[in-house]
């Protein structure tokens, strides 16, 4: 069996192009692109996915080995596609951060912070808890496979070398951010209702009993009742989030 070594440069260039798209996406993917995960692990995951995707979509790449400029432009195009896909998946986590921020404010815990492992910075405690719980459920339910499936489908929508429509990208970003904020508010809706009713009740109590220190009674009572509500609705909240994530992944690629 003879191997035509003249094909190796083109194959190597195709490998690097596929790796550019997948690597950019992995660096932003929920669960894989966290700041506390070593870069070598991220690169290993991207390399493994590249070895899987390359045989499936090698024919989609038409590499011109005579022009380094066109090769670099094509690689930049692949990186941008990977960033768009990864950032869209990453935005889904912001829904939990929005919900956590609203819940913390309604329970009087807006001052309680901790390190957010997904962002590498300080964040509200409840928001961090919901984010970690959401990531755990994504892996426990194999929903992260949908991100990989979206990556595979992206070759049908964003063909290598084809000029990306800025309108499609803008529409994708707008829908992603709007949906994340909407879901975040829906997840925190029970606590918004609780906060409204509770604060009205405290206001009435303060007018009826002016000598009573309402603040010292209201804060611990708000936290206690709020956590009771949190325990009752957490299952429904995370179920809603998982359905939202699955819907985003299914709608990620069919833009046109």
Q: PLM ranges: what are they?
A:
Residues 1-256:
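Hydrophobic alpha-helical segments and their helix-loop boundaries in membrane
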